[in-house]
């Protein structure tokens, strides 16, 4: 089934060119089914790229998905035009009375700042609390995952001596988990972060389980059933050249490992994680669909 996004959202042209089926509101209304309602709280500076990456993965699932773009109410984006934000994003204050099958919380370039010093931390805490009553399942990504674990469980993040950047081999520790269905025993995942959450800091008795990790970069994916949340520290949504773009932005300071052939930044990297991203997001959407109430009003009851 296709994904429904605004007709003039820039991601639409990109996805249609890739063969992803994108549905108009009129076409969606003709289908006598309830679509999955997914909110994307996009904290990334380059919002258009992140919108496209997430929509690509959700649009490949076998369900009709309505993707709604949400922003922090009292934060002004410096890297995405005000026109784009105004046209396509709703502030959280405007949607807080509504209910969603799923919520995706992205990362943000604030990893080196204490949580309480992030300008929108108070609102993000309210959003995390709101997700427990108004959202059926949540997927938190990178800094969003660290922030959620800190908010819900008091787990601190730790700064890294240098940026963890590259494509790393990860171990699937729970192949029978519905989140990991179809993923191989070992699989590649792009990593790009300055901080980490450590296994030894995970509290006992909270039901947290490690689904995947890497010998080189640590924890990758944690299931948090009590909060109905999947915490993903890395980036299966990344495009083939996302890490290359970050390397150029950082002026060549942090060469991504296991990425450029022969460590030559002029060489074209191979995307070895695309299928893994589709599997994980497909599993998340499918499990959300299987367990969410048919009536959105029943979410949180």
UniProtKB/Swiss-Prot annotation:
Q: Name one GO molecular function term.
A: homoserine O-acetyltransferase activity
Q: Which residues form the active site?
A: 142, 235, 237
EC no. given is 2.3.1.31
Q: Which SUPFAM superfamilies match?
A: Class I glutamine amidotransferase-like (SSF52317)
Q: Which reaction does it catalyse?
A: L-homoserine + acetyl-CoA = O-acetyl-L-homoserine + CoA
CDD domains recorded = GATase1_HTS
Q: Which residues form the signal peptide?
A: none
Listed under GO biological process in this entry are:
L-methionine biosynthetic process from homoserine via O-succinyl-L-homoserine and cystathionine
> What are the subcellular locations of this protein?
Cytoplasm
InterPro entries noted in UniProt: Class_I_gatase-like, HST_MetA, MetA_family
List the pathway annotation: Amino-acid biosynthesis; L-methionine biosynthesis via de novo pathway; O-acetyl-L-homoserine from L-homoserine: step 1/1
Q: Where is this site: Important for substrate specificity?
A: 192
Full protein name: Homoserine O-acetyltransferase
What species is this protein from?
Answer: Novosphingobium aromaticivorans (strain ATCC 700278 / DSM 12444 / CCUG 56034 / CIP 105152 / NBRC 16084 / F199)
């Amino acid at each position: 089934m296709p994904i429904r996004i605004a007709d003039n959202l820039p991601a639409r042209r990109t996805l249609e060119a890739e063969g992803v089926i994108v549905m108009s509101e009129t076409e969606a209304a003709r289908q006598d089914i309830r679509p999955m309602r997914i909110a994307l709280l996009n904290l990334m500076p380059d919002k258009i790229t992140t919108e496209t990456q997430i929509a690509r993965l959700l649009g490949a699932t076998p369900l009709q998905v309505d993707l709604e773009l949400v922003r922090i109410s009292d934060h002004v984006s410096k890297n995405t035009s005000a026109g784009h934000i105004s046209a396509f994003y709703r502030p959280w204050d405007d949607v807080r009375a509504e209910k969603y099958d799923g919520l995706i919380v992205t990362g943000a370039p604030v990893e080196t700042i204490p949580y309480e010093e992030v300008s929108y931390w108070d609102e993000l805490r309210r959003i995390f609390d709101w997700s427990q009553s108004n959202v059926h399942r949540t997927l938190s990504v990178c800094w969003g995952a660290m922030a959620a674990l800190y908010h819900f469980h008091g787990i601190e993040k730790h700064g890294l001596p240098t940026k963890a950047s590259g494509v790393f081999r990860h171990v699937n520790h729970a192949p029978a988990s519905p989140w990991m269905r179809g993923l191989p025993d070992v699989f590649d995942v792009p990593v790009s972060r300055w901080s980490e959450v450590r296994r030894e800091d995970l509290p006992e008795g909270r039901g947290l389980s490690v689904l995947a990790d890497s010998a080189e970069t640590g924890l990758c994916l944690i299931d948090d059933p009590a909060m109905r949340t999947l915490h993903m520290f890395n980036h299966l949504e990344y495009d083939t050249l996302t890490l290359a773009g970050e390397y150029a932005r950082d002026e060549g300071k942090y060469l991504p490992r296991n990425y450029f052939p022969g460590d030559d930044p002029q060489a074209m990297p191979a995307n070895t994680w695309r299928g893994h991203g589709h599997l994980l997001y497909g599993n998340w959407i499918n499990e959300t669909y299987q367990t969410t109430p048919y009536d959105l009003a029943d979410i949180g009851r």
